[in-house]
């Protein structure tokens, strides 16, 4: 049937062919045939009706609404077309138009309840929760012949949705759970319940219902290809079919990704996104596109920004999009872009940014041009949040004293939410002093916040870093670095390489060389095992540890040992040379060359020869390795031939020859 045109269909077979295409869910082909037929008979009721149905199934709701509008004009006595038009307009997010059309049917008893349900859905989508609740309660109280067990169930589900939107997650869970028990398994209800559990932080229960949705989806619809992309099988798009929508698989995988992301299981979050049924990028729904942008930001930031910017032009877009785009601009220090987006979308700030988030972003944007003013703004936010934290601490204590478990849980959740707001404010303040290399003031800030943050992983890590940077507090730094490393000791490569390097340096600086060597042996063993399991994978942890140690000795003026350590850390070059490792290595070489040019140090010929040989190896293996990772959204790109390790290693070698007076 592929490519079948209207002219190829035998006389009298047209209707049968169209119905077969619809039966087989080949709606796009049916649309082509019906479009051709309607050019010949533009007033055909059957043609317009089938075309509207096909457009609706293809989720082309605006086009479906046009078909039903024409039918309503051609056959005003058939009011069902107005209802279909209103439903299609609602699905197209054209809420005022949908409301206007639905009001024309309100006085018709045959459609009264269906119109009320549609109007409740419209008000819910417009965030008019009181209006939606009034209509839902009216439906539940009215009853009538159109009412019954199913409508009662729908009413309870609708109340659950309203409770969820109002932030009453536990009450919403009760409604959805009761509805699920009454109806038996339904993917949409299971998803609603999982979402309510997620929002009330019952992640295990949410994951249980997500697993149910996925299990049912795989068993009932193996053709949807769940998990195929993750295991590397090349599969074609399953499209945005009604079946896919009915399974709630896309929603379930997105929610699983959100939970794993919240729990900082980032690999599992990415897996959840690739496990969902495969679709082409242009077929992706806004939530999936948003989540892809966020979860692949570290690996593909340019693509992530493009996706979020694209979503911002769509109506509607996930409500988190606006805030997340602005926060990411600030994280990547594109403060000008953040300021532009805020200025160009002032109408969105009131709808999508909380007062806290707006004030925080305003302070972050100010950091670039007026750090002192930004610090004052951040300090105001910090003061407000610490006051809230103290009040919530008292509430938790009182609830525990009264043995009120529900009140304890509510207060603890509020405390954790407030702390997650406070940490970024504190870190933004600290960064202002950090950029000025005023490390004692950073430490002072962290000490002031110890009563709230002493158990927070971000706070502990940054305290360790600021103690390390002061060069006379290595022992205190060890006290913060060690618990981080010991927590992941069995999977030590899950710890950031710079944390391991700083801990080793701290050991060395207080003469605990045995501890440093033991840690390095542990890293080496894990790298060997990983290299055995995956020979092509580049692993840089031990390399970076040695580079940092080598850098330390160079900084202390012991270039003979320091440079040799740097060179050995990058052996073999074909496995250890990368943008990050080259960054550390070239800093040591530049420092060495500067001191040699000033005649403040003398190197043995054997060390110079070792340096030249090392740079030649870098030249050989660095052709495809960027010397610098360019700014994600930088308009002026570096020359492609100059931004390589090969080019920079040649420059360093030429400088060595020039300084020591060798002929090249």
UniProtKB/Swiss-Prot annotation:
PROSITE patterns cross-referenced by the UniProt entry: TPR_REGION
Protein origin, superkingdom: Eukaryota
Predominant localisation class: other
Keyword entries, A-Z: Cell projection, Cilium, Cilium biogenesis/degradation, Coiled coil, Repeat, TPR repeat
Subcellular location: Cell projection, Cilium
GO cellular component, one term: axonemal microtubule
Keyword Repeat appears in the UniProt entry: yes
One GO BP: intraciliary transport
Coiled coil: 509-532
Signal peptide annotation: none
Molecular function via GO: intraciliary transport particle B binding
PANTHER family: TETRATRICOPEPTIDE REPEAT PROTEIN 30 (PTHR20931:SF0)
Family that this chain belongs to: Belongs to the TTC30/dfy-1/fleer family.
Purpose of the protein: Required for polyglutamylation of axonemal tubulin. Plays a role in anterograde intraflagellar transport (IFT), the process by which cilia precursors are transported from the base of the cilium to the site of their incorporation at the tip.
Protein name: Intraflagellar transport protein 70B
Species this protein is from: Bos taurus
Name of the encoding gene: IFT70B
């Amino acid at each position: 049937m592929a490519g079948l045109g209207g002219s190829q269909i035998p006389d009298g077979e047209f209707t049968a062919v169209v119905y077969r295409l619809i039966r087989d869910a080949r709606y796009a082909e049916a649309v082509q045939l019906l479009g051709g037929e309607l050019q010949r008979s533009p007033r055909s009721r059957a043609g317009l009706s089938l075309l509207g149905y096909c457009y609706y199934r293809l989720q082309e709701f605006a086009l479906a609404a046009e078909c039903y509008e024409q039918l309503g004009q051609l056959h005003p006595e058939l009011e069902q077309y107005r209802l279909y038009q209103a439903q299609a307009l609602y699905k197209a997010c054209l809420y005022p138009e949908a409301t206007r059309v639905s009001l024309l049917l309100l006085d018709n008893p045959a459609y009264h309840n269906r119109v009320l349900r549609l109007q409740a859905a419209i008000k819910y989508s417009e965030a008019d929760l009181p209006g939606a609740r009034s209509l839902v309660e009216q439906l539940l109280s009215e009853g009538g012949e159109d009412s019954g067990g199913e409508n009662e169930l729908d009413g309870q589900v609708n109340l659950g949705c309203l409770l969820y939107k109002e932030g009453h997650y536990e009450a919403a869970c009760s409604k959805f759970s009761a509805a699920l028990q009454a109806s038996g398994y339904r993917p949409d209800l299971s998803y609603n319940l999982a979402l309510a559990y997620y929002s009330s932080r019952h992640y295990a229960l949410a994951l249980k219902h997500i697993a149910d949705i996925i299990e049912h989806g795989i068993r009932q619809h193996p053709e949807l290809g769940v998990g195929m992309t993750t295991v590397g099988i090349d599969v074609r798009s399953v499209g945005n079919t009604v079946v896919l929508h009915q399974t709630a698989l896309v929603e379930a995988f997105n929610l699983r990704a959100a939970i794993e992301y919240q729990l900082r299981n980032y690999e599992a979050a990415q897996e959840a996104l690739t496990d969902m049924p495969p679709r082409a990028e242009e077929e992706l729904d806004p939530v999936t596109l948003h989540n892809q942008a966020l979860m692949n930001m570290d690996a593909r930031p340019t693509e992530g920004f493009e996706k979020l910017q694209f979503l911002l032009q769509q109506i509607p877009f996930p409500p988190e999009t606006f805030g997340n785009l602005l926060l990411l601009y600030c994280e990547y220090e594109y403060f000008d872009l953040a300021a532009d987006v805020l200025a160009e979308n002032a109408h969105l700030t009131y709808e999508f940014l909380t007062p806290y988030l707006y004030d925080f972003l305003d302070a972050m944007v100010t950091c670039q041009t007026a750090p002192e003013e930004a610090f004052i703004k951040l300090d105001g936010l910090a003061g407000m949040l610490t006051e809230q934290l103290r009040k919530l601490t008292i509430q938790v204590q009182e609830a525990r004293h009264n043995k009120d478990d529900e009140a304890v849980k509510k207060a603890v959740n509020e405390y954790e939410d407030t702390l997650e707001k406070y940490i970024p404010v504190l870190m933004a303040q600290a960064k202002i002093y950090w950029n000025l290399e005023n490390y004692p003031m950073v430490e002072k800030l962290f000490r002031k916040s110890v009563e709230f943050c002493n158990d927070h992983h971000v706070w502990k890590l940054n305290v360790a870093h600021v103690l390390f940077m002061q060069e006379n507090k290595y022992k205190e730094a060890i006290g913060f670095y060690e618990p981080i490393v010991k927590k992941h000791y069995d999977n030590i490569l899950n710890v950031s390489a710079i944390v391991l390097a700083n801990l080793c340096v701290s050991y060395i600086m207080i003469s605990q060389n045995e501890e440093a060597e033991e840690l390095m042996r542990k890293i080496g063993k894990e790298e060997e095992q990983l290299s055995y399991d995956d020979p092509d994978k580049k692993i840089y942890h031990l390399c970076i540890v040695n580079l940092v140690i080598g850098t330390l000795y160079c900084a202390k003026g012991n270039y003979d040992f320091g440079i040799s350590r740097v060179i050995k850390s990058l052996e073999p070059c074909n496995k250890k040379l990368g943008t990050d490792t080259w960054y550390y290595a070239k800093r040591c070489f530049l420092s060495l060359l500067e001191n040699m040019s000033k005649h403040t140090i003398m190197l043995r010929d054997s060390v110079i020869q070792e340096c030249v040989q090392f740079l030649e190896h870098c030249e050989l293996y660095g052709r495809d390795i960027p010397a610098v990772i360019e700014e994600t959204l930088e308009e002026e790109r570096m020359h492609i031939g100059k931004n390589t390790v090969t080019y920079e290693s040649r420059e360093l070698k030429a400088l060595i020859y020039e300084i020591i007076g060798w002929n090249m």
